[in-house]
């Protein structure tokens, strides 16, 4: 008897916890890693709707630590799930001398060690071209939003949910949804997934626009510098409109001090903004 497709979905129950083993680890930069976790069989997929994410759970120093991550792999990938994660080491940031609990835990995992996954989780679903389903909160019914142009503001590892959508939309030749990404980082070295983003921007130049801003740019930098501003949004993202949606993901200062006030200043209404 053939195995049903549904049986090959790893995340069968969003409330359950699934232990998955670390099968590969790649150093992307001095503080960023790609972690590959194995699924129950080589034929399994994760089972994550586009727009959703997973939680990782670990007992660290007698405390249950839970963090949300968007995989950079998709349900086209069988047998594994990939996460790209920035490690927050201790004694690097004066505000956080202890560093990140979960990211340092992941950094110290050995091949074969398992960690608990839970999901899918999320309020955003991208089911068909130009159509998003958005829940106001976890328990509410999703509302449909038709989108012609998606604007994206990402900071640091906040790029991963954007990449999930960018890949999905550009892969589907029938999907004509336009996308514009404003990607904020501290330094040029911090730009995650740059090669892939620039390849997409070249291959799908009519559909996808890419712009960067850096806190500490090099002298020959040709993009923007400083915090995300109203001027940057005005120049590089779609204007307010019924079929516009601006997605925002990144650290709290990016959202609270930069993106949100700037979008409000430019008259984007609540239904035109989605914050991960």
Swiss-Prot record:
Is Lipid biosynthesis one of the keywords UniProt gives this record? yes
Cofactor(s) of this protein: FAD
Broadest EC class assigned to this enzyme: oxidoreductase
- Residues the entry annotates as binding FAD: 107-137, 146-181
InterPro entries the UniProt entry points to: CBR-like, Cbr1-like_FAD-bd_dom, FAD-bd_FR_type, Flavoprot_Pyr_Nucl_cyt_Rdtase, FNR_nucleotide-bd, OxRdtase_FAD/NAD-bd, Riboflavin_synthase-like_b-brl
Name the job this protein performs. NADH-cytochrome b5 reductases are involved in desaturation and elongation of fatty acids, cholesterol biosynthesis, drug metabolism, and, in erythrocyte, methemoglobin reduction. Responsible for NADH-dependent lucigenin chemiluminescence in spermatozoa by reducing both lucigenin and 2-[4-iodophenyl]-3-[4-nitrophenyl]-5-[2,4-disulfophenyl]-2H tetrazolium monosodium salt (WST-1).
- Protein name from the UniProt record: NADH-cytochrome b5 reductase 2
- Which organism encodes this protein? Mus musculus (Mouse)
């Amino acid at each position: 008897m053939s195995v049903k497709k549904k049986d090959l979905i790893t995340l069968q129950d969003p409330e359950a916890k699934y232990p998955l083993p670390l099968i590969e680890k790649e150093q992307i930069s001095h503080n960023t890693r790609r972690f590959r976790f194995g699924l129950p069989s080589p034929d399994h997929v994760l089972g994550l709707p586009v727009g959703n994410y997973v939680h990782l759970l670990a007992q660290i120093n007698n405390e249950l630590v839970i963090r949300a991550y968007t995989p950079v792999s998709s349900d086209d990938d069988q047998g594994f799930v990939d996460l790209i994660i920035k490690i927050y080491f201790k004694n690097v940031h004066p505000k956080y001398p202890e560093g990140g609990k979960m990211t340092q835990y992941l950094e110290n995992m050995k091949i074969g060690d398992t960690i608990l996954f839970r999901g899918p989780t999320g309020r955003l679903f991208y089911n068909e071209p130009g159509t998003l389903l958005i829940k106001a909160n976890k328990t509410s019914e999703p509302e449909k939003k038709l989108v012609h142009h998606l604007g994206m503001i990402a900071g640091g590892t906040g790029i991963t949910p954007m990449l999930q959508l960018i890949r999905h939309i550009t892969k589907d030749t029938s999907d004509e949804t336009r996308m514009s990404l404003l990607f904020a980082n501290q330094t040029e070295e911090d730009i995650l997934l740059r090669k892939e983003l620039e390849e997409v921007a070249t291959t799908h130049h009519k559909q996808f626009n890419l712009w960067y801003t850096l806190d500490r740019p090099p002298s020959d930098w040709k993009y923007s510098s400083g915090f995300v501003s109203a001027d940057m949004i005005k120049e590089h993202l779609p204007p307010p409109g019924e079929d516009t949606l601006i997605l925002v993901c990144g650290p709290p200062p990016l959202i609270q001090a930069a993106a949100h006030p700037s979008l409000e200043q430019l008259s984007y209404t609540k239904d035109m903004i989605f914050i991960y």
